[in-house]
Amino acid sequence: MVELEWLETFEIGLQEIDDDHREMLRIMQDIKAAGEARDRKRCARLLDALIDYSKAHFEREEKILDEIEYPSLEVHEAYHADLLNRAEEVKEACKAIRSDRDFRECCEQMFGFLIDDVITGDMKIKSFLQERGIAEPN
């Protein structure tokens, strides 16, 4: 399975959002460990936990973006909705798999979820925050 490590470059400069991203990574590290231990029940619970936490994170993030008048908020909200839909599909596919190896590979697809959110989606927010002087470049 892939290695999951927090990098300072992932930070967007808003503590609450950065803390959420770290927690999402921690849950994914737990998913990885459960997959390696072939603990499918724990892995399935953690997939649910990751999606639940992500939903709450997206709500917090969208509220903050609304408060700072982020110009692409509606696009970002739609992006979050798409990520959640894809994550739910991956989760259900993982739960239906019978082979341990295929299950671990399926769980790895979920890792793209955080990477997609942090790298693709939230780096645009980071640029906006830095342009506005709300966050310092790191």
Where are these predicted regions, by residue range?
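Small-residue-biased structural context
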Residues: 1-138
